[in-house]
UniProtKB/Swiss-Prot annotation:
This is Ribosome maturation factor RimP. InterPro entries: Ribosome_maturation_RimP, RimP_C, RimP_C_sf, RimP_N, RimP_N_sf. One of its GO terms (biological process) is ribosomal small subunit assembly. Required for maturation of 30S ribosomal subunits. It comes from Proteus mirabilis (strain HI4320). Keywords: Cytoplasm, Ribosome biogenesis. It is found in: Cytoplasm. NCBIfam families: PRK00092.1-1. The gene is rimP.
Amino acid sequence: MGLSTLEQKLTAMVSAPVEALGFEFVGLEFIRGRVSTLRIYIDSEEGITVDDCADVSHQVSAVLDVEDPIQTFYNLEISSPGLERPLFTTTHYEQFIGEEVAVVLRIAMQNRRKWQGIIKSVAGEMITVTVDGKDEVFALSNIQKANLVPHF
């Protein structure tokens, strides 16, 4: 997923404190609004508890308070990736080859921004998704948002 400059800066700042606590830093998203939201996704093999989220929130808040990279009011949310796991990196796409994904593009391809299909392959920064039997290739930098599609 192509991250904004702010999201890149935030990732550089918060990934180390998250990992120092023993968690996987999955990724983050900054959602602008009247009150913006900084959502940080963490994971571990044992799963994530509310206490884990509180510990990470405390640690990350301390870093953000010192560095002060966000020049507006915002809420900090710490979350597990959940069933509709967001995909941020090529490693995430490689990990979930064969799984269904919903993709929203920054710039439309073939007059559409929303796509859904099966992750087929990853080559460099290019993601191939099979949509209705046809392979579509997306540049990671053009992916605004991507989530796994759970099946129940």
